[in-house]
């Protein structure tokens, strides 16, 4: 049994098969689309979500997701069955471009951009916590090479997709991400009984963030969380 980092971030330490077994009997609606694919979303009282489904080619997936209070206008389209490309258009300007695993894939078309409302979130995979923006900046200054501010979201797979060096099936939503904590709360995932951090933070835009419980003893407003994150989203067409 191996734990997927996105599931671990929301308090699920079992593997994919065990997680799906836990969903049996939860009466999660499953949506079938005409192309032969299907998908469903379990929403936990804690705000944690588990998206699962089967693509047109029969490939199955199980991904973590997260409820977020922050919604933004965007242009979005799918690059594979459940991986989507988004341009955030807050205030009419592009505020960010990123890839995200979506929990409701049929809200987007494949390759053709749609105007949608998106609720992005970030799930911590390899995370460093800094006590303040000053501490984060100091740590950045001690490293040679690329330095990023405390509110960034960089999807490395974007360049490969746009250049044609990678396909949507090869890409992922893993990103370099940092945010300043606005609030943080230890919540219990009722599906498993395990805790995780539910964080509201300001990155390129404010969004919800999930971190494994062991990430920090005390996350506080003004702290900076940075590292490798899995970006996810819910779409309102």
What label would you give each PLM region?
Residues 1-27:
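N-terminal alpha-helical "arm" segments
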Residues 181-209:
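OB-fold (S1/OB) nucleic-acid-binding surfaces
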Residues 212-228:
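Short nucleic-acid-contacting surface segments enriched for D/E, G, S/T with interspersed K/R
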Residues 230-237:
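Short, Lys/Arg- and Gly-enriched loop/turn segments at beta-strand edges
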Residues 81, 95, 113-115, 174-176, ...:
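A general secondary-structure signal for short beta-strands and their flanking turns/coil
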Residues 156-189:
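Extended boundary segments
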Residues 29-169:
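Long, hydrophobic alpha/beta structural blocks
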Residues 1-3, 205-207, 229:
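Short, surface-exposed polybasic-aromatic patches that bind anionic ligands, especially phosphate groups
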